Amino acid sequence: MWLLSRLVILCVMFIVMPIVAKTSNIVINKYGWWDVLFAWDSGWYYKIATSGYNFGLDYDKTEYAVAFFPLYPLSIWILMQVGIPFAVGGLLINNLAFLAALIVMYGWVESRHGTNPARWTTVALAWCPYSLYGAVIYTEGLFFLFSISALRAFDNKQYFWAGLWSGLSTATRITGIALLPAFLISAWKQRLPMKAYFASFAVAGGIVIYSLYCLIKFGDALAFLHAQRAWRSTTGFALAGWWSMLMQVVIGAKNVEVGYIQDIWYPIGFAMVVISAWLLLHFRLQLGNRMRYGFFLLWVLLWLMSRQELPSNPFSSEPLIKLVLIFGSLCLLWLCRTQIPFVAAVYGFFSFAIALNTGLTASVERYVYAIAPVSFAWGLLFAKYPRWGYAVMAFCGLILALYCVRFAQDFWLA
């Protein structure tokens, strides 16, 4: 699954996009062959690996590199010291780490539920449209590897390894801190030995070391937190943003933008989709297996209707996919909470709490994708309903290809 999904990404990036660029007269290789795999956060990792960190007192107005955690750019820098170019090093680390994460995840799920759910879990991880971030110059691969390894080690009562992997996860991303309450609550509830508590406190190791670095270099141990203000001025649940996204699906982006129903046909179309779905449910016994084809057709139709972004908000594209991935995954995690390891379930809920309280709706879908227990839950669902799994993965493959096209052109994705 890893190889096939990566081949799709490579084909779109290096075969399809050059043709699109030539016919559309756009530039996709300003810096080199790897530019299609380099966008947004990638630029910050390049700056850190080549020039180091920076920080200033005007952090509420100016973006500083210290907001990005060090393990990924540090790993790239180490490879650069032996002659490996930045792009090659960054891509090797992320892709190989993502592959290793899939292998670890497969073994963990297989030991709990058998081969079929393990296969579906890795399929969900590899074919989710946001698995694109496991192929480009981003931190997804490393974070997946360390967080999954930490959860699996703790679940298997390998507390030394749990502490080591969890410390590396917080050195990669601040969201790894969700492992701390997950380990502590699990240790308390399951009455685990003192070693489990030591593993819990080791989670903070990556953040503590980075804080010491910030204190020594910039005189501010929390510089990485303060620097976040340039990207977001508030925190908390972005209710207005999520409501706007929901309204994009229900009444259409054009009507949301103007603040009233200007395009009457979109709400009528949405109502027809809802009524059709109700009819499919009502006559499900008569329709039999044909019902699922009807639902899939309605899903594709609603996606085509709603995928337009707000003209005033470039971060508002694909609202239907984002809402289903984020809140659908949260509901599924709750429903599957007794079927996945307790420590994984607790970690998942704390990770959602962090992701949904950033004060923004942008990038939340990518943060949710990086919550390993979410894929665990999707794997269990698809193993139970494989025909739905095949349909969902086919759709995900299409979206993955479309996301590659957007990323290659430096359009906002997540």
Residue ranges and their predicted role:
Residues 5-22, 37, 180-314, 321-324, ...:
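Membrane-lumen/periplasm interface segments of specific transmembrane helices
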Residues 88-89, 105-127, 144, 342-346:
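Transmembrane-helix signature of polytopic, membrane-embedded enzymes
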Residues 113-115, 150-161, 187-191, 339-340:
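Membrane-interface transmembrane helices that cradle and orient dolichyl/undecaprenyl
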Residues 61-66, 70, 74, 82-100, ...:
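Loop-to-helix entry region of an early transmembrane alpha helix in multi-pass inner-membrane enzymes
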Residues 136-142, 364:
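Short acidic/glycine- and proline-prone juxtamembrane loop motifs at membrane-interface regions
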Residues 104, 124-127, 142-161, 180, ...:
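Specific aromatic-rich, kink-prone transmembrane helix
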Residues 38-84, 238-250, 355:
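Short hydrophobic/aromatic helix or loop-helix immediately within or flanking a transmembrane segment
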Residues 77, 89-112, 275-280:
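Transmembrane-helix motifs of polytopic, lipid-linked glycan transferases
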